[in-house]
């Protein structure tokens, strides 16, 4: 019994031609997986004259292996640690300072005069001329540059806001999130290109101007509050003495360091809010409970509540010929006059910028403080409702 072999089909020849074309075209070959997918990390070496079926080699870019961490005054080049590794930066600054002192010592050894002893009883002793000034100037200049760079780097580390620090810290988190383990010394240097020195100077300059303006506004508010405090305390004869207490003003750098970063600001606001909650719950809102809610509402309606504000004026809304007897009429009047906009014009807002995400160490919240915050929010809502009823 014979075996039937079908004749060649035209479609098979077309498939072979397409396959050969795909092998000839290097752009249609799949890219390798792994570290070669990183941006600017590999150089693809493909020859257009390579025959089909050959292996394509991917040569890594050697420049991506060298860290390029920025610094303000360090001279260590590729050995410079990441900007978010502060202990390593302080250590390199100290090492550079010691190196600068070593260069100064070498310059002193080259330039100081030397004695020549001709005989044992030769008095006075003879001194050789001083060494070459140019030979001693080279290590002296090198030491001066090294120590000056230490000063610049320390000035950068003293800043409360460092764009290089924030950038390195962000990309280290990105690398950890992607499953990589960045170097503890160099950071995630293969994930980003640090910003230039000019961009860093511009960002720091903008931050310094904004912080200086904010501190000046706070100082003006403090001066006004001191004057008001003095005017509210008259003497025995009834005279009011307007005396401005001099406040010691520190330099701008120390005030910026006291201001701190956003995390410190957030923690400071949280602590101040907690103390205000406790003060309100211990004094004004001490008797505000759910058990005496009906009694408090009755006192508010009768105008005998201690929480009612007699100086509060309701927003002036002119209804004209409209009535609000039914729900439809009330909705029509509400949409027509927009009382929320009226209330918005008569309300002052105090806006504080806080981070929109939480740190890992702030996840553990105290249950007592949460209960205090809930009770305070409930009390505030009742106080606002009482104002509207009045």
Curated annotation (Swiss-Prot):
Stretches assigned to the Mitochondrial intermembrane side: 1-87, 153-390
Pfam family of the protein (one): Mgr1
Keyword Oxidoreductase: no
Mitochondrial matrix topology ranges: 105-135
Transmembrane residue ranges: 88-104, 136-152
Location in the cell: Mitochondrion inner membrane
Region (Disordered): 1-55, 365-390
Keywords: Membrane, Mitochondrion, Mitochondrion inner membrane, Transmembrane, Transmembrane helix
Membrane protein topology class: Multi-pass membrane protein
Cellular component GO terms, alphabetical: mitochondrial inner membrane
InterPro entries: i-AAA_Mgr1 (IPR013911)
Superkingdom assignment: Eukaryota
Biased composition (Basic and acidic residues): 373-390
Keyword presence, Membrane: yes
Oligomeric form and interacting partners: Component of the mitochondrial inner membrane i-AAA protease complex.
Task performed by this protein: Component of the mitochondrial inner membrane i-AAA protease complex required for mitochondrial inner membrane protein turnover.
Family label: Belongs to the MGR1 family.
Official protein name in the record: Mitochondrial genome required protein 1
């Amino acid at each position: 019994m014979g075996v039937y072999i079908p004749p060649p089909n035209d479609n098979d020849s077309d498939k072979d031609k397409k396959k050969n074309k795909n092998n000839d075209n290097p752009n249609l070959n799949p890219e390798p997986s792994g570290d070669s997918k990183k941006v600017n990390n590999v150089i693809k070496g493909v020859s257009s004259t390579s025959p089909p079926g050959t292996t394509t080699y991917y040569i890594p870019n050697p420049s991506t292996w060298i860290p390029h961490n920025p610094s303000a005054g360090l001279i260590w080049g590729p050995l410079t640690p990441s900007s978010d590794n502060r202990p390593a930066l302080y250590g390199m600054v100290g090492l550079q300072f010691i190196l600068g002192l070593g260069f100064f010592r070498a310059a002193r050894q080259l330039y100081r005069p030397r004695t020549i002893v001709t005989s044992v009883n030769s008095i006075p002793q003879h001194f050789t001329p001083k060494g070459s000034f140019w030979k001693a100037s080279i290590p002296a200049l090198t030491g001066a540059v090294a120590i000056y760079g230490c000063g610049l780097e320390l000035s950068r580390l003293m800043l409360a806001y460092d764009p290089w620090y924030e950038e390195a810290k962000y990309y280290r988190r990105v690398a950890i999130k992607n499953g990589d383990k960045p170097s503890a010394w160099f950071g995630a240097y293969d994930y980003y290109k640090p910003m230039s020195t000019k961009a860093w100077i511009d960002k720091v300059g903008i931050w310094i101007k904004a912080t200086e303006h904010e501190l000046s506004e706070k100082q003006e508010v403090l001066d006004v509050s001191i004057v008001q405090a003095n005017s509210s305390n008259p003497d025995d004869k009834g005279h009011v003495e307007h005396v401005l207490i001099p406040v010691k003003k520190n330099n701008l750098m120390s005030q910026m360091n006291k201001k701190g970063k956003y995390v410190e600001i957030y923690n400071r606001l949280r602590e101040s809010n907690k103390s205000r909650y406790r003060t309100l719950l211990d004094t004004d809102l001490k008797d505000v409970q759910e058990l005496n809610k009906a009694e408090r509402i009755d006192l508010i309606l009768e105008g005998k509540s201690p929480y009612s504000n007699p100086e509060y004026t309701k927003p002036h809304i002119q209804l004209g010929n409209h009535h609000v007897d039914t729900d439809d009429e009330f909705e029509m009047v509400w949409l027509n006059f927009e009382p929320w906009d009226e209330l918005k014009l008569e309300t002052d807002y105090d806006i504080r910028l806080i981070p929109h995400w939480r740190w890992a160490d702030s996840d553990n919240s105290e249950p007592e403080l949460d209960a205090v915050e809930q009770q305070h929010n409930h009390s505030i809502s009742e106080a606002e409702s009482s104002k509207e009823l009045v």
